[in-house]
């Protein structure tokens, strides 16, 4: 569903931010 896609994108963004901080 739409919410699953939103959560998936949010997880990708968080992962990208975490990788950038490392």
UniProtKB/Swiss-Prot annotation:
Intracellular or extracellular location(s): Secreted
> Is Transcription regulation among this UniProt entry's keywords?
no
Q: What is its main location?
A: secreted
The tissues in which it is expressed are:
Expressed by the skin parotoid and/or rostral glands.
The terms describing its cellular component in GO are:
extracellular region
Keywords in alphabetical order: Amidation, Amphibian defense peptide, Antibiotic, Antimicrobial, Secreted
An example of a Gene Ontology BP annotation on this entry?
defense response to bacterium
User: Does the record carry Secreted as a key word?
Assistant: yes
Similarity section: Belongs to the frog skin active peptide (FSAP) family. Caerin subfamily.
Give the function comment from the record: Antibacterial peptide, that adopts an alpha helical conformation which can disrupt bacterial membranes. Each caerin displays a different antimicrobial specificity.
Which named protein is this?
Answer: Caerin-3.3
Organism encoding this protein? Ranoidea caerulea (Green tree frog)
């Amino acid at each position: 569903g739409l919410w699953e896609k939103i959560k998936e994108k949010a997880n990708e963004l968080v992962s990208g931010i975490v990788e950038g901080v490392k």
